[in-house]
Amino acid sequence: VEVHCANGYLLDQFLQDSTNQRTDAYGGSIENRARLLLEVTDACVAIWGANRVGVHLSARGDVKSMGDSDPAATFGYVAGELGKRRIAFICAREAQGDDRLGPALKAAFGGIYIANEKMTKHTAERLLAVGDADAVAFGQMFIAKPDLPRRLRLDASLNEPRPEMFYHPGAEGYTDYPALA
């Protein structure tokens, strides 16, 4: 089970201070803003076990008016708390710039850390080689490349995605990309 606390969805809105304006036990301090995510995680762990639960985070907070005044503190706290619960993994959507939080989140969590966000083969290999991630996740890249693992393994050309068709109803833009021969 992956608990989705990213991309401006409800748990992410509670976590980040740009959207959480509450004044009760679920607002204000980092601990309070993280409360709902941790309660949901604890409930999932109680049902499925820690080894079957992961959490998806969006430390960049750049979607749907999201943001946090101190993402290092907020997401560092969350990573540490999730680490105490010994869940299976955290997957973090984050940029590859100098100010990225991935290595700090991985260290605070202490478990399997999956890096995600516009990965390329080169970026993925580099993150894995230097130990900044235990695994990488490819999201949108799969939409235009249903045979992505094979293409990466063979250093084959990559289909150009058509972002205007992402999340469009019907098969066009999902199942009409050519596969390798």
Where are these regions (language model features)?
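Flavin-dependent oxidoreductase catalytic cores
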Residues: V1-A181
